[in-house]
Design a protein with these regions (language model features):
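Acidic, Mg2+-coordinating catalytic module of metal-dependent nucleases/exonucleases
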Residues: 83-84, 89-90, 94-98, 132-172
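Amphipathic alpha-helical interface surfaces
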Residues: 65-72, 92, 108, 112, ...
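Short, surface-exposed basic-aromatic patches at helix termini and helix-loop junctions that form
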Residues: 99-105
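Conformational gate/switch positions in structured elements
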Residues: 30-33, 112, 170
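A short, structured active-site edge motif that brings together acidic residues
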Residues: 18-21, 106-120
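Short alpha-helix plus adjacent loop in nuclease-associated cores
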Residues: 112-138
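Conserved non-catalytic scaffold segment of RNase H-like nuclease domains
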Residues: 1-99
Length: 172
């Protein structure tokens, strides 16, 4: 998913696609060790797949070739010359590269996660928030630096978890 946002915070364009040749070919990520209620459980993977099919049926998503996705990105880059950003941009670069989508077409980019770690992650009140809310890494039990944890600290703990559906993660 991609969202073009103006300097005033208004969404100018958005695009949500599932990659042709990949969607439905591979199972969605799931950890069989997790309980059914966990987001990354096998039960959740089935719910998430149903949700993707509902998005296709409603027109919220298309199934698009990497070439079509690249064309949309190229056009958006030509129209707006945006700064490419994402939370954990290196992850997105890698996933897109694996599907032959070139994010290197953008002349400016920065990683929101790196910025959040430098500005928010080092704050004592953020770290205490993570301990209080049990937003800790599994192995080392250190404060999480995830988009969810950061957003809950900034906006409030009542904020719903991100849906991990690319477009909504970027837009909402």
């Amino acid at each position: 998913g991609a969202v073009i946002v103006g300097r005033d915070g208004r969404i100018v364009e958005q695009f949500g696609a599932l990659v042709f040749g990949l969607f439905g070919k591979f199972d969605l990520f799931a950890d069989p060790a997790l309980p059914d209620s966990a987001f990354w459980s096998e039960q959740s993977a089935q719910r998430r797949m149903k949700n993707y099919h509902a998005m296709i049926d409603s027109g919220e998503r298309s199934i698009s070739s990497p070439a079509l996705i690249q064309q949309w990105l190229w056009g958006a880059n030509q129209r707006y010359q945006p700064t490419l950003t994402a939370y954990n941009l290196a992850f997105d670069f890698g996933k897109c590269r694996n599907t032959r989508i070139n994010l290197g077409i953008f002349s400016r980019s920065f990683c929101l996660m790196k910025a959040a770690k430098k500005v928010i992650g080092i704050r004592a009140d953020y770290q205490q928030f993570c301990y209080d809310q049990d937003l800790l890494t599994a192995k080392k039990r250190k404060p999480q630096m995830t988009a969810d944890a950061m957003a809950k600290f900034i906006i409030g703990n009542d904020l719903a978890d991100e849906p991990h559906t690319a477009l909504e993660d970027a837009r909402d």
